[in-house]
């Protein structure tokens, strides 16, 4: 019995070993055949990705590597086991492939590279990376490449014609703040083009909501404000932001200097449009807005805010719109401007503000505001 049992164990071991060898053979042979299919232009074992066929996110090749293996996915072979020498080597090779993928995209995204300007075919590959990849570092590098190329006027049309606008806009749904910021930067560069603006207007509400709800003074918030500022350079799409003006004043009141200045650039675009005057006057402003003039605030911030007030005052016909003034609620910008004389008296005081230019501009604005708001009292 002992001998028969020993023979049985040996036989079983041989069968299991042969089976394992055969499985490894099939796996390696399958990978080789799949690579040959892809090298010949076929889809391999990956389903066709529509317009991105032949340029999927795992087809990006590194100029420094002769291999056509996938470099954007960290792929661990079935035989890679933790704690084994073979597994350690396999994982090291997988990490190396991922690193090469990142460098391959970043090489083209680098401003110091000679390959900064991509051809339409290369832009198509980068767009496919953005569309198909789920790896944050791949998305980040690809979006940097797109952002750099979108800075060139001739590439803005190419990226649009390749279907890049909805591809990049879809990334706005991500929760990764770094990736979202890069997507906003790409859209900001693309929005300089008039046709791109026409197509991007459908995303303005989403960008606006994300901007006002993002962490205060964050990179995502600033990138969103820059995009909205670009989208409101012309008067055509400013009405989309009419319901968010109060939120912008809230950001202005609570934000740091950089956030304040970016909000003011956006509000200045709106203030230059006479059609947006009523929306601006009806917006709720924080009570802390008046205290801005009581302290030694940044000079540029106060001067830009006064420029906004001047544009609103010039565009609003106070005497003609006297019946409509009853529609403005307490706490609105309209009532703030009516009571601006109180703030101005403090600013004009010698001890209130150290900058002579600010005090002069405040004095001129108050005089102009009084003449426009209370013309009958001047008679």
Curated annotation (Swiss-Prot):
GO BP annotations of the record are:
axonal transport of mitochondrion; mitochondrion organization; positive regulation of transcription by RNA polymerase II; protein localization
Which residue stretches are annotated as topological domain Cytoplasmic? 30-379
Question: For the modification Phosphoserine, which residues carry it?
Answer: 61, 67, 72, 110
ARM repeat residue intervals = 111-151, 153-192, 233-272
Residue intervals annotated with topology Mitochondrial intermembrane? 1-6
Residues of the region (Mitochondrion outer membrane (MOM)-targeting sequence) are 1-6, 26-37
Q: Name one Pfam family in it.
A: Arm_2
- Specify where it is mainly localized: mitochondrion
Query: Which key words are in the record?
Result: Cytoplasm, Membrane, Mitochondrion, Mitochondrion outer membrane, Nucleus, Phosphoprotein, Repeat, Signal-anchor, Transmembrane, Transmembrane helix
User: What are the boundaries of the region Nuclear localization signal?
Assistant: 89-98
Where are the residues of the annotated region Disordered? Answer: 34-69
Places the protein is found: Mitochondrion outer membrane; Cytoplasm; Nucleus
Q: How does this chain sit within the bilayer?
A: Single-pass membrane protein
Q: Where are the transmembrane segments?
A: 7-29
Physiological role: Regulates mitochondrial aggregation and transport in axons in living neurons. May link mitochondria to the Trak2-kinesin motor complex via its interaction with Miro and Trak2. Mitochondrial distribution and dynamics is regulated through Armcx3 protein degradation, which is promoted by PCK and negatively regulated by Wnt1. Enhances the Sox10-mediated transactivation of the neuronal acetylcholine receptor subunit alpha-3 and beta-4 subunit gene promoters.
What family is reported?
Belongs to the eutherian X-chromosome-specific Armcx family.
Q: How does it assemble?
A: Interacts (via ARM domain) with MIRO1, MIRO2 and TRAK2. The interaction with Miro is calcium-dependent. Interacts with Sox10.
Q: What is this protein called?
A: Armadillo repeat-containing X-linked protein 3
Query: Organism source for this protein?
Result: Rattus norvegicus
The opening ranks of the lineage are: Eukaryota, Metazoa, Chordata, Craniata, Vertebrata
State which gene encodes it. Answer: Armcx3
